[in-house]
């Protein structure tokens, strides 16, 4: 399975083509739009989300509510394009018109793709870089992940996410799955402890008032995975490697870990390895889950726990020092409309990116043309965990 996105932040639309979704999967566009709406929320978001009403239009690959097995094309319209029609349109404009619109960018932002992207593609107007490197593209990725979540639901696989930390303020390390799921989206920073939520809001307000931004840590949990998805045989087939690549490909994500993650470096092996147990009804399982459901590059049947680190957004309303690429003189970096904190929204993006990686790995493990074939193969693998 694979997908390709296209579109600029202030262009007319985002387009995504997904290939490899099995036939006969029931799809309701409102289920996808429900996930799209979640991405737009979260405390600390900027004015852009007051303009956009992200909804998906499916233009191929689905007929009368069911997938065909052919590529699925989805379109997300950028409502803000009405304010950018001339500057972001395909038709040529004069340099005078461009200058009068004051949309040309020559002062790159530290921490963004602006300068290096301009060098790589020889763009003297850095807007050509930031329009594509913008996190607006993640709307298309959430649409893909929403499709994958529908697929996973048909396989009895749950996936959900939360915020673990914002600006150094931390929620509890982990909750049991029932508490986790019962309290999803109970507040606008996506943590479970409401007292922690208010402290995070205060931290976000403080950063906003100072013209600054803050980052944090998000967590994604995948439950009821069949064992043995991935491989120990080759490096490029390891499931944790694939998930890690997906997570750090999200805008502003700088790190990823599984289970207890970097805390494993502080403990002896006897406190980190998960003991193997057996029950005649469910088969093999682990007495703990320090490793986050992954052993030897494969799923072991325990919940897969993924932690992603998001740096603060690089656009600052009190900008850092930069250099004008035309004059080479010192200037403050360009200010673009932005969020002060996008960690709650990023947890939704991360959830959907992981959903794609999980669905892709399942379809590589159990090659299937239609959903019924996939369901049978996964049922057989789950039975193997009991009978082996």
From Swiss-Prot:
Catalysis performed (reactions): 5-O-(1-carboxyvinyl)-3-phosphoshikimate = chorismate + phosphate
Chain segments annotated as transmembrane: none
GO biological process: amino acid biosynthetic process; aromatic amino acid family biosynthetic process; chorismate biosynthetic process
Cofactor note: Reduced FMN (FMNH(2)).
Cofactor(s) listed: FMNH2
Sequence positions that bind FMN: 132-134, 251-252, 296, 311-315, 337
Annotated signal sequence range: none
Origin superkingdom: Bacteria
Role: This reaction introduces a second double bond into the aromatic ring system.
Record note on quaternary structure: Homotetramer.
Identification of the protein by name: Chorismate synthase
Organism: Staphylococcus aureus (strain JH9)
Native organism taxonomy: Bacteria, Bacillati, Bacillota, Bacilli, Bacillales
């Amino acid at each position: 399975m694979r997908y390709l996105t296209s579109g600029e932040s202030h262009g007319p639309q985002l387009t995504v083509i997904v290939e490899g979704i099995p036939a006969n999967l029931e799809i309701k566009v409102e289920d996808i739009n429900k996930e799209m709406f979640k991405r737009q929320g979260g405390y600390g978001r900027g004015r852009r989300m007051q303009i956009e009403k992200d909804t998906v239009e499916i233009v191929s690959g689905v007929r009368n509510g069911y997938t065909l097995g052919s590529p699925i094309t989805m379109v997300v319209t950028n409502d803000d394009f009405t304010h950018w029609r001339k500057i972001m349109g395909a038709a040529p404009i004069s340099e005078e018109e461009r200058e009068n619109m004051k949309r040309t960018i020559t002062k790159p932002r530290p921490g963004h793709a602006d300068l290096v992207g301009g060098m790589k593609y020889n763009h003297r107007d850095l807007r050509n870089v930031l329009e594509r490197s913008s996190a607006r593209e993640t709307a298309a990725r959430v649409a893909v992940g929403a499709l994958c979540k529908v697929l996973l639901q048909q396989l009895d696989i749950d996936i959900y996410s939360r915020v673990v930390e914002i600006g150094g303020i931390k929620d509890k390390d982990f909750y049991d799955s029932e508490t986790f799921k019962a309290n999803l989206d109970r507040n606008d920073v996506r943590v479970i402890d409401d007292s922690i939520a208010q402290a995070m809001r205060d931290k976000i307000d403080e950063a906003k008032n100072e013209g600054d931004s803050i980052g944090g840590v998000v967590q994604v949990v995948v439950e009821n995975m069949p064992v043995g998805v991935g491989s120990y045989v080759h490096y490029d087939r390891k499931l944790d490697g694939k998930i890690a690549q997906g997570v750090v490909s999200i805008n502003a994500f700088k790190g990823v870990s599984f289970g207890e993650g970097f805390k494993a470096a502080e403990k002896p092996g006897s406190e980190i390895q998960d003991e193997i147990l057996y029950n005649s009804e469910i088969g093999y399982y682990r007495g703990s889950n320090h490793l986050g459901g992954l052993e030897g590059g494969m799923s072991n049947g325990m919940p897969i726990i993924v932690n992603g680190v998001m740096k603060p957004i690089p656009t600052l309303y009190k900008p850092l020092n930069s250099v004008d690429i035309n004059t080479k003189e010192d200037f403050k970096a360009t200010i673009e409309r932005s969020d002060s904190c996008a960690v709650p929204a990023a947890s939704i993006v991360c959830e959907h990116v992981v959903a794609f990686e999980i669905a892709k790995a399942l379809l590589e493990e159990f090659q299937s043309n239609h959903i019924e074939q996939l369901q049978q193969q996964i049922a057989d693998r789950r039975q193997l965990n009991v009978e082996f």
